[in-house]
Curated annotation (Swiss-Prot):
Protein's recorded name: Hydroxyethylthiazole kinase
Gene Ontology biological-process annotations: thiamine biosynthetic process; thiamine diphosphate biosynthetic process
Function according to Swiss-Prot or TrEMBL: Catalyzes the phosphorylation of the hydroxyl group of 4-methyl-5-beta-hydroxyethylthiazole (THZ).
Sorted UniProt keywords: ATP-binding, Kinase, Magnesium, Metal-binding, Nucleotide-binding, Thiamine biosynthesis, Transferase
UniProt-annotated binding residues for ATP: R126, S171
Pfam families xrefs: HK (PF02110)
Catalytic activity, reaction form: 5-(2-hydroxyethyl)-4-methylthiazole + ATP = 4-methyl-5-(2-phosphooxyethyl)-thiazole + ADP + H(+)
Species, as recorded: Acinetobacter baumannii (strain ATCC 17978 / DSM 105126 / CIP 53.77 / LMG 1025 / NCDC KC755 / 5377)
Broadest EC class assigned to this enzyme: transferase
Annotated CDD domains: THZ_kinase
InterPro entries given in the database record: Hyethyz_kinase, Ribokinase-like
Length: 275
């Protein structure tokens, strides 16, 4: 039977393993998020590589510890790289994370491409409530790439996506993790209302899940990354109330996280699965 204490122990072990191994994470991400994502990975103990050229994608994915694919600003060439890298990851047992930014009928081309990427079986699908709910086949009104649905509503609509991935991670006021590996839904609390106001925090979270997936199971990877962000957000908010100072202190705590902080501040709850 899964317990919160056992899960937190596994998160601490995953964090320790990432510090020891410095996993190489290939990021095919959007132009808005690339710099911030790379800095978050470096601060967390991983090694980012923003390789999104289709002519280099296959060879680089083969040597990567993990792959992160984010559809925030896809171009035709970048989409080719995504398809090549996702296929290569599946064939070479490289864990990979799919972040279906903006999925829905308004952005139809990227949504079609996202559907095609699902055939390569991502380890984790990560998104906001609207993206995940729409990807699961529900009709949801979104505001651009921002969610208009609460995460506690979305997780109850997302179980069908577990046919495509081992784990589904939904970010929001509380975060929810659905998994084929755990007999409960995991709710992660913490963070700050300022986090969504900083460009690319969600995108960087997806890449951090990929980094953790190089050293642990998909479920613990998603949980570790969400706890990592939740603790950093909570502690940063205790020191800063404005966006500029919060952003800087948040990155500091991304870097300063350790086993003691995880044990002290990780706030998770187990919920019954309601398919």
């Amino acid at each position: 039977m899964t317990s919160t204490s056992n899960l937190i122990e596994q998160v601490i072990e995953a964090w320790q393993n990432m510090q020891a191994k410095t996993p190489l994470v290939q990021c095919i991400t959007n132009s808005v998020a690339a710099n911030y994502t790379a800095n978050v990975l470096l601060a967390s103990g991983a090694s980012p590589a923003m390789i999104d050229n289709p002519y280099e994608a296959e060879s680089f994915t083969k040597i990567s510890s993990a792959l992160s694919i984010n559809l925030g600003t896809p171009t035709s060439e970048q989409m080719q790289a995504m398809q090549i890298s996702a296929k290569t990851a599946q064939l070479n047992n490289v864990p990979w994370v799919l972040d279906p930014v903006g999925y829905g009928p308004i952005l139809a081309w990227r949504s079609q491409m996202t559907d095609e990427l699902l055939q390569f079986k991502p380890s984790v699908i990560r998104g906001n409530a609207s993206e995940i709910s729409t990807l699961a086949g529900n009709q949801v009104q979104s505001k651009g790439v921002d969610s208009t649905l609460s995460s506690d509503q979305a997780y109850q609509q997302a179980f069908s996506l577990l046919t495509h991935a081992s784990c589904i991670a939904i970010s929001g006021e509380s975060d929810y993790i659905l998994s084929n590996e755990v007999d409960a839904v995991i709710q992660v609390n913490g963070g700050s209302p300022l986090q969504p106001k900083i460009t690319a925090t969600g995108c960087a979270l997806g890449a951090l899940i990929a980094a953790y997936s190089a050293v642990t199971t998909p479920t613990i990877a998603a949980l570790s990354a969400h706890i990592h962000f939740a603790i950093a957000g909570k502690l940063a908010a205790n020191q800063a109330q404005t966006m500029g100072s919060f952003s800087s202190i948040f990155m500091d705590y991304i870097h300063m996280l350790d086993a003691n902080l995880i044990e002290q501040y990780a706030d998770i709850k187990l919920l019954n699965k309601q398919a």
